[in-house]
């Protein structure tokens, strides 16, 4: 019985108590189940009675007594005790904890995933870097975290659409085209333009396809370098991200919104709802009505739409495509966007608390030997995803970028993340999987079943076995927490803890017989436990987009 199973049993018991007239509360969809904070207080605990007491207009211990009576006879539960003000402490039946191993192996790749779809469509926008240069190190973090979050949300039962918003309209694109043209003509690139070897490479590629480029009038040549340079840069960005294992369901074009008249339609909708006004020759949105520090212009006095107007049109476009929740993963320099996006959501009649989630991430730096790594040879003034992958590989890069909370800055030690020692987290987790795979290959060579349906899991009573079983049982709740709190790092930290628990189990509990020993029932039970651990490690690494090697 996993914590998720126990939570379901508690919810069912609440439902029965309500149906019987013993409790007058709204039946929750889920409840908290955790390990007891004090040893000897059972296998799991729940504060559900304390949480329901106010709504039930009963003392917590009275609510606990109502639930304990219904749960004590539940299959897999040996006893239910009431502690303190009303905590429920559960002791599982002899084989109930061991059954977790069998549950994991039976479920395989689906273990930890939601049993059924939630019926909620989520749009997850991430990276969305300007297509004016290679994918930067900061964008690499959003790529790793965003892709992992998409996988985790999918596992948690959401229907997820990953999206890259291409900022292919505006001044920065004009400057990029001018920079490529200057490089092609052998002229000095404007100070406000884009610099670095990659600009010269793109210019050479454009020239190769258009040898007549420099014979064209300046405006025509600029149009060519802008369009073809943009296409080449986008091709490189796509290739880089695909090589990093990052998938997008849609590449959305800002320019396409302009062309389709989406900005005008957004303004019309907002005006019809009374949130738009005209002043000083410009068109404004009353964002201060919804928590912004000042109203924002949609159209400037020169008649040109603002970036904010495009943001509003893009929000409307996403909701119009049927997405229930919109998640924006933005960089540290976008703090000001939070209030603006919430105001946009509210102006369109949505509830920002329900329909919108803006996640702000902090920056990444690299170091080697204690010294900062400051510059890319190709990009010139900034580090790129390509630089990072070249230095450490895809697995180490993705894992290292994901394992820390986004709200903290990240300094990646290139020496550490390539070290094959236990102080390197990605090696530590991957090595646990490889170590298990080696053990299971040896078991198969001895003719031993590695996932026997008849294994006697009631024999798994050693403290290290119990710790490992409890750890495996936590995985579904870890996925749920990582999804609801938008924190893929929770999966990484869980895997590191699980790997440590496994290594301690391996050191304390011999799995395979040695010498002339005969394999007994305990061998089969431990092999099932080991196989279950491999499933969870592989599933968890897969959610982070990291491989689970069979050999290291």
Swiss-Prot record:
Its EC number is 6.1.1.19. SMART domains: Arg_tRNA_synt_N (SM01016), DALR_1 (SM00836). It comes from Frankia alni (strain DSM 45986 / CECT 9034 / ACN14a). Its main location: cytoplasm. GO terms for cellular component: cytoplasm. Keywords: Aminoacyl-tRNA synthetase, ATP-binding, Cytoplasm, Ligase, Nucleotide-binding, Protein biosynthesis. It is found in: Cytoplasm. Belongs to the class-I aminoacyl-tRNA synthetase family. The keyword Protein biosynthesis applies. A motif ('HIGH' region) lies at residues 129-139. Monomer. This is Arginine--tRNA ligase. Pfam families: Arg_tRNA_synt_N (PF03485), DALR_1 (PF05746), tRNA-synt_1d (PF00750). GO terms for molecular function: arginine-tRNA ligase activity; ATP binding. SUPFAM superfamilies: Anticodon-binding domain of a subclass of class I aminoacyl-tRNA synthetases (SSF47323), Arginyl-tRNA synthetase (ArgRS), N-terminal 'additional' domain (SSF55190), Nucleotidylyl transferase (SSF52374). It catalyses: tRNA(Arg) + L-arginine + ATP = L-arginyl-tRNA(Arg) + AMP + diphosphate.
């Amino acid at each position: 019985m996993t914590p998720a199973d126990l939570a379901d049993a508690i919810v069912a018991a609440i439902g029965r108590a309500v149906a019987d007239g013993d409790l007058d509360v709204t039946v929750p969809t889920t409840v908290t189940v955790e390990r007891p904070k004090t040893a000897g207080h059972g296998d799991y605990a729940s504060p559900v009675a304390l949480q329901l007491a106010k709504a039930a207009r009963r003392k917590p211990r009275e609510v606990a007594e109502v639930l304990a009576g219904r749960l004590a006879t539940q299959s897999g539960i040996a006893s239910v005790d009431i502690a303190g003000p009303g905590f429920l402490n559960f002791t599982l039946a002899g084989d109930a904890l061991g059954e977790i191993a069998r549950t994991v192996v039976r479920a395989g790749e689906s273990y930890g995933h939601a049993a059924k779809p939630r019926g909620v469509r989520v749009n997850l926008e991430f990276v969305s870097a300007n297509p004016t240069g290679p994918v930067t190190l900061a964008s690499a973090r959003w790529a790793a975290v965003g892709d992992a979050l998409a996988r985790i949300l999918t596992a948690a039962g959401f229907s997820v659409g990953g999206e890259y918003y291409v900022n292919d309209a505006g001044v920065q694109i004009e400057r990029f085209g001018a920079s490529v043209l200057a490089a092609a003509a052998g002229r000095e690139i404007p100070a406000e333009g884009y610099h670095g070897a990659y600009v010269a490479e793109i210019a050479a590629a454009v020239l190769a396809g258009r040898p007549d480029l420099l014979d064209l009038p300046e405006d025509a040549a600029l149009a060519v370098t802008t369009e073809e340079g943009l296409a080449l840069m986008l091709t490189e960005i796509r290739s880089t991200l695909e090589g990093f294992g990052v998938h997008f369901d849609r590449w959305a074009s800002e320019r396409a919104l302009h062309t389709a008249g989406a900005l005008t339609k957004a303004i019309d909708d907002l005006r019809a709802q009374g949130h738009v006004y005209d002043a000083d020759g410009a068109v404004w949105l009353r964002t201060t009505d919804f928590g912004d520090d000042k109203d924002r212009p949609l159209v400037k006095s020169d008649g040109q739409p603002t970036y904010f107007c495009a943001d509003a049109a893009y929000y409307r476009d996403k909701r119009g495509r049927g997405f229930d929740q919109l998640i924006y993963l933005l960089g540290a320099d976008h703090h000001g966007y939070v209030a603006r996006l919430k105001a946009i959501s509210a102006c369109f009649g949505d509830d920002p608390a329900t329909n919108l989630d803006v996640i702000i991430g902090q920056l990444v730096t690299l170091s080697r030997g204690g010294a900062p790594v400051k510059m890319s040879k190709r990009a010139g003034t900034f580090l790129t995803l390509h630089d990072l992958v070249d230095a450490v590989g895809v697995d180490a890069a993705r894992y290292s970028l994901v394992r820390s909370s986004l709200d903290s800055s990240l300094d990646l030690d290139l020496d550490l993340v390539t070290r094959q020692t236990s102080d390197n987290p990605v090696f530590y987790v991957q090595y646990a999987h490889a170590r298990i795979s080696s053990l299971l290959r040896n078991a198969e060579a001895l003719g031993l079943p590695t996932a026997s349906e008849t294994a006697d899991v009631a024999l798994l009573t050693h403290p290290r076995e119990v710790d490992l079983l409890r750890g495996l049982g936590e995985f579904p709740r870890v996925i749920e927490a990582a999804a609801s709190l938008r924190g893929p790092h929770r999966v990484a930290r869980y895997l590191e803890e699980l790997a440590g628990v496994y290594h301690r189990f391996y050191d304390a509990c011999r799995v395979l017989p040695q010498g002339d020993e005969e394999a007994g029932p305990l061998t089969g039970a431990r092999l099932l436990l080991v196989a279950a651990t491999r499933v969870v490690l592989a599933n968890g690494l897969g959610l982070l987009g990291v491989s689970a090697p069979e050999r290291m």
